[in-house]
Structure formats: C-alpha cells, structure tokens
Amino acid sequence: MALDGFETVRIVSAGGGVTAEFVPDANMVCHSLTHRGDELLHAGRGVRAYAERGKTMGVPLLHPWANRLARRSYSVGDTHVALPEPEGRYGLDPNGLPIHGALPGRLRWAVQEPTAADRTSARLRWDGDELLELFPFVHELRIDAWVGDAGLQLITTLRATGDDAVPVSFGYHPYLQPPGAAPRGDWRVSLGASQRLVLDAQMIPTGLTEPLSPQSFQLGDQSWDDGLAGLASPPEFAVTAGARTLTMTFDEGFDFAQVYAPPGQNFICFEPMTAPTNALISGDGLTVVPPGGEHRTAFSIAVADN
C-alpha cells in the first residue's frame, strides 16, 4: 500500500478488530491505528510533512533524543558533539533548540519478512556519516510490533554494535485521538506518575521535581506540556472519552513520561521516554549501553469499551 508516495506495512489482529499501519521510509512511524474501523491516532499534517519537516503525527519515534536539547552541543563520557546546522538534519523548537532527534525522512528502516499477519519487525542501522554527525555512537534499532483485538504493542530494542558505549535517550510521541464526538473538555484523564519535572522558561528540566496532584481529572480547558517522573508500577496513562477508554502502558524500559495536550486540539499525548528531556546534556536518568549490550523497551496502547 502507498500513502503520500510512501509504501506502508499493514498488520491486522487475528479477530480483525484492530489494524495498524507503519511507514518504513519515514522512521517506521505508525501513522494509523484503528479499532472496529475507528481511527485512534491524530494524523497531523500527514506523513510527508512528518518525514520532510518533522511535523509529528501518529506514533513517531524520537531518536536519538526525545523532546529538546538545551543547546546544539552535548558530551557523553569522553565524546563531545557539536551538532551541524539543522537544515535537513533535525528540527528546532520555537526557541531555536534542537527537538525530536533526526528528521524522520533520514531514517529508513528495513522491514523483515513477516511471520504472521498480526505482526511486523524492522531494523535501522545507525552507522552512516550523515547520522553519526548527529549522534556518533554506532548502534542498531529494532522495532517489533504486534496487534491483538485489544490494541497494539510496540517493542524497541537498541543494540550497541560498535566499539563504544551508546547513551539511550529516545522516546515516542503517540497522538491519541479518542473516537466519537465527546468534547475535549469532558475527557477524563489519569496519569500513572507521582512527580512533575520543574521546567525552565525554555521547557528544559531544572533537576527539581514537585508532587503531581491530582493524578486523575477532567481535562476541561487545561493545557499540558509537562515532564513526569516517579512512574507507577506498571505505569498506565489513560483517557476516557465517550464510549471508549484508551490506555497506554509503559511495559518495559521507560522511566519518564511527557504529557502533551494543547488547548483546542482533539488529541492527547502520553509520551514514553527512556530519559528525561535534555538527558544527553544533563546526564540525568541517562542509561548507557556497553558495546555488545542492548536496551529493550515496550509500550502498549489498549482500547476498551466503557
């Protein structure tokens, strides 16, 4: 199948109630997830705008850093990186800070032969000069996706394939769009975290936290763009709207979250993150994988009738 000139990979649950579609040449983004024919993801400006300009949509992978960096340079151990000019390489936020890692159109995944109609796997080698100038740590990523009649599970494994250890700072940015006509103000939200990261004026964590309260609430006219820590076990984030509830569970490997719900938009994002925003600079919460080692993550998006 093709979408905006991109080939897609479609998987279908055994019972036929859930489908998911991925775009290998646009960073393996899951651009569509349906339940009984109803779309659960916000399409944003479409796949081409995502691939070429980093306009996030669907369920995008943010790699090699999730959300923002406080400047255009960082150091990990003895490796010091000065990022090149952003054009065609990575995006900038309104403050001119690097955001969301490499532009998706630069990340083209090799899809593995399918073993069943309800799953797919793909690999990305991070070893070319254009990628290493952003993140000079040779590694491989693997995505394994599976759909059941309750939803989607997505497993991401980073393996350090070079001679150097690899810092892990990726995340995902799922744009959940509850089906039906329930007004945004009536949505009920629950957050599986106990702490909010204190941010500075440029949305960079200061290193301080404050209690998160309440953890369950009606969204109303609230606006969210907040980093969270102190995740529950298991970390579950949910939105109830109309007749269905969408629940994200961070199954493995994600210790931080970002919640994004801008006013006037019919989506909410519960973002699983391996490290907090700016971890490549601050070092806070940063996992480093030794040569030959790996870091595995998993999250699930489930849909249920109320």
Regions found by a protein language model. Give the residues of each.
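A short, structured loop/turn motif at beta-sheet edges
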Residues: 75-80, 112-121, 146-151, 180-184, ...
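Extended, loop-rich substrate-binding clefts of extracytoplasmic carbohydrate-active enzymes
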Residues: 1-4, 86-149
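Active-site/ligand-binding surface loops and adjacent short beta/alpha elements
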Residues: 165-167, 174-251
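Beta-strand-rich N-terminal accessory domains
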Residues: 1-89, 233-254, 293-304
